[in-house]
């Protein structure tokens, strides 16, 4: 019922409305998370984030291309380690998966071409940026869309889907577009809920965070760390993880998560396809 028409006889004027979200490229609610470069040299294996290459507040495409070329000819570069998670499994503070199930979601991906390699670099940048700005996020997404237009394969589609979803999550969580000037990809729901809870009262946070964001399956423990025996693999290979502390890398502090990443990196069997 239109209350304006009921009391005045004048119908309410209809204004055209733009959709707030766009249709996802990849139909399944799964995203590529915790993307880190893997480099190995003799008895040392390192998983680390890609450097955030910014110029004048936006993504520096020329530096990114130079970095991709370096990785293509590198003798130590093995690929990118990553985990595929559903929206409902990424609880921000923890991962709602049993360790043996999570282990099946983690793998090392060796991109077969420069397009997919650059998409992985952009994914790692997006998760490991210390300070997010709308200009940087939008420039990174624009570059990812351009890469996909050059190589529209299913793996590029999935990586672009993940970048779009993570970018929308960042814009929503850090309130970079309060006016909602343009439709965007749907973001991760648990991060939107986390931001709403963090903005509430102390009492509400104490009540709601354990309900929605804590799981005893793979929880993050900032005090947990590997000892020297755990850092060294069976073949005497030392493994280290380096990443930027952001809300998207909190899972890497969990000992069970780091252990799975270590196992996958030391296996030495990267795959050349994300989706088969």
Swiss-Prot record:
Coiled coil: none annotated. The keyword Hydrolase does not apply. The keyword Lipid metabolism does not apply. Pfam families: Herpes_UL7. Plays a critical role in cytoplasmic virus egress. Participates in the final step of tegumentation and envelope acquisition within the host cytoplasm. Belongs to the herpesviridae cytoplasmic envelopment protein 1 family. This is Cytoplasmic envelopment protein 1. It comes from Equine herpesvirus 2 (strain 86/87).
